[in-house]
Every structure is written in structure tokens, then in C-alpha cells.
Amino acid sequence: MVAGGPFHYYLERLCEHYALSIHGVGMSIGAEGALDTEHLQRLNVLLARYQPASFSEHLAWSTHGPCFLNDLLPLQYDQQTLNRVCEHIDQVQNTLGRRMLLENPATYLQFNASTFDEPTFIREVVRRTGCGMLLDVCNVYVSCINHQWSTQEYLQALPLHETAEIHLAGFSEAFDRNGQRLLIDSHSAPVAAAIWSLYQQILEHTGPVATLIERDNELPGLAVLLAEARRAQAYLDNHGVQP
């Protein structure tokens, strides 16, 4: 979020042709401590400059005291965490003067002390803060496989009508120390058949929603990426007007 440089040059050119979606990874919405107000103010300047169609952050934490951990870490889903997350989202939305979208996480462990399941927790956050939802379909699938949850029950518990953006991605596979299959939200593979299937099912409830395909590692040729984009667009076209 620097003031100048090549990133801004290219963003300004992109803004001439496309609406932007700005996606944050460093707000640490779930942290026990206070939000970084300097980070929040820099973000406010960035959003004022580009006026994106949407801004989103993750349901996760990445800070503890003065330490920044370069990862999106899971939360214990209890009343105290719910209150804290809602307070932080209220602070973000009040500072930015806009609605924030909250992305569901991909997780690899659960806390025994949690008193909410994940989709119920997300639903309560959305209800209390008025934030929207960024529904990451790959994260839904990864978490449900890793924790042996039902994808159907998970989706049914979410406020799908509040979905304002959708992410699709591929995952990688590993095994834990007990030999159990473990999915990793690596963004390093094509969108899997199971993700496409869930995406079509979700669109039946949401209608056409702005969709992003994420690919960070093991990048294929451009033709492969464009083919995935065309596939997503075809599903969107089947469910109404292009977003």
C-alpha cells in the first residue's frame, strides 16, 4: 500500500477498463489485540483512490502483539471470539465507510473449546455486522473434507443470500501423521470437478455473482487459465445477467 510505483501505474490502467475487487490478507480480523490503525488508514487511502467494487478480508488472525505471522491462522469459535470479530469488522466498516466482505477460511484443525460450528459463526458475524460474504468454494470443500463435515449442511447453514463475491481455486493433497487425507488450499492446481459442482449448486441460490479464479503456484499457460475463466462465465450466464 505504498504511495507510488509500478503497481499503482498498472492499477490505474486497469481501472480504465475494469471494476476492481481489493482483497486483503493482513487485517488480522480475528486477532486478540487491537487492529493496526496505521494499516487501516493506509487501506482507507487505497480504497478512496481506486473506489473498488468490493473490499474483502479473511476470517483469520495473523498478528500477536508486535509479531506478524505471514499466514492466515484459525480461530476458536466461541462467544468471546464472535464479539471480538464483530467489533473489529464494525471498526473496519466505520473507518472505510463501506461494507466489507468476509471470506470463509480453509482450516486444518479445530479447537475443542469451540461452541459454534463454522458456518453458524459466520452467519452470526454477518447478521450482527451487516458485512457481506466472500464465499470461497475451494475453502468450503477443503475444510469439509479435512474435518469430515457435510458440504451440503455447511452451505445450508451459511447466509448465501449475502454472497457478493465467489472464489474458485484448486487444492493439493497430503496426509497427516495418522495417514488421513489432508487437503491444502494451495492455489496450485486447476479447479477440481468437485469445486465446479459446488459452484453450480451455489449459483442456484445466489444467482450470478462476481467470480475470481485464484492461481498462485504452478502456473499453467494462459490458454488453460482462460479456459477456466470461460467455464465460470458460462455457468454465470446460465444463471442470469453477467455481473
Residue locations for each model-derived region?
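Acidic-and-aromatic substrate-binding clefts and catalytic sites of carbohydrate-active enzymes
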Residues: 1-7, 28-38, 108-116, 141-148, ...
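Short, solvent-exposed loop/turn segments at secondary-structure junctions
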Residues: 26-28, 60-62, 106-107, 139-140, ...
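Gly/Pro-rich active-site loop or hairpin
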Residues: 2-4, 34, 72-76, 82, ...
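Active-site acidic/histidine proton-transfer and metal-coordination neighborhood
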Residues: 36-132
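C-terminal helical cap(s) of enzyme catalytic domains, especially alpha/beta-barrels
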Residues: 222-242
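Acidic/histidine-rich catalytic cores of soluble enzymes
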Residues: 93, 98-178
